[in-house]
Amino acid sequence: MRIFRPWRLRCPALHLPSLSVFSLRWKLPSLTTDETMCKSVTTDEWKKVFYEKMEEAKPADSWDLIIDPNLKHNVLSPGWKQYLELHASGRFHCSWCWHTWQSPYVVILFHMFLDRAQRAGSVRMRVFKQLCYECGTARLDESSMLEENIEGLVDNLITSLREQCYGERGGQYRIHVASRQDNRRHRGEFCEACQEGIVHWKPSEKLLEEEATTYTFSRAPSPTKSQDQTGSGWNFCSIPWCLFWATVLLLIIYLQFSFRSSV
């Protein structure tokens, strides 16, 4: 006689969908780290321009450009040299509230090292970021710098590199359009370079006049727009405005339903 054992019955397996299918997740925009921010600063454009110009300036040596978000000002390993670009121009884009602004106070730090025996050199680079003064978060947009501006900055880097690493007379440094007088107040509390104690340098009027006769600037400020309108304005796509329009829409729908029910 066979004994019936109910626990040995084999039921077909039930494949339940994972909870993630039914769960609603509110995903906040992730804050970008220093490494992500620095990698987004048109890394390919920087390397392309740097390699082309170094191949022309020093074809016998091999140079490499590395983005290093942990680079520190005046903290150098033995044999390394430093160049600090204090008056670069860049456009910032906030990934949280979509606010964009142009800044003439972008600071770029370079550390350089040349191994004469191996005929190889290395450049480490860090672009200091600025925080959005509307919501407090920011990242440097991939299209933050024009290719013409990058070429001018690389020219200054190579000039300093030839002076410090090769002992040559590099030539004259290029002054960019961002070095001109700007009446907008620079907010040091939102500037990463200012927070680390780097003092921004602004050239004298004489240097600006000399540079204006020898260098054609790629982009000039529009005369129709005031300087206060250039860096700020009404951002109707920001989160506060989105909440405002959503509230207005819900209020209109509520009034329509209440009016129909009363009729």
Curated annotation (Swiss-Prot):
Q: Which named protein is this?
A: Receptor-transporting protein 1
**Could you tell me the gene encoding this protein?**
RTP1
Tissue localization of expression is: Expressed in testis.
The record places the following residue ranges in the Cytoplasmic compartment, namely 1-238
> Keyword Nucleotide-binding, does the record have it?
no
Q: Which residues cross the membrane?
A: 239-259
Mode of membrane association: Single-pass type III membrane protein
Recorded GO molecular functions are: olfactory receptor binding; zinc ion binding
Q: How does it assemble?
A: Interacts with olfactory receptors.
The cross-references to InterPro entries, in alphabetical order and at most eight, read:
R-trans_p, ZAR1/RTP1-5-like_Znf-3CxxC
Which loops or segments lie on the Extracellular side of the membrane, by the record? 260-263
Which GO biological process categories is it annotated with?
A: detection of chemical stimulus involved in sensory perception of bitter taste; protein insertion into membrane; protein targeting to membrane
Q: Domain of life here? A: Eukaryota
Where in the cell is the protein located?
A: Cell membrane
The protein's job, in short, is: Specifically promotes functional cell surface expression of olfactory receptors, but not of other GPCRs.
Give a Pfam family name: Zn_ribbon_3CxxC
Q: Where are the zinc fingers (3CxxC-type)?
A: 88-197
State the disulfide connectivity: none
Example of a GO cellular component annotation carried by this entry: cell surface
Q: What UniProt keywords are attached to this protein's entry?
A: Cell membrane, Membrane, Metal-binding, Transmembrane, Transmembrane helix, Zinc, Zinc-finger
Q: Give the protein family.
A: Belongs to the TMEM7 family.
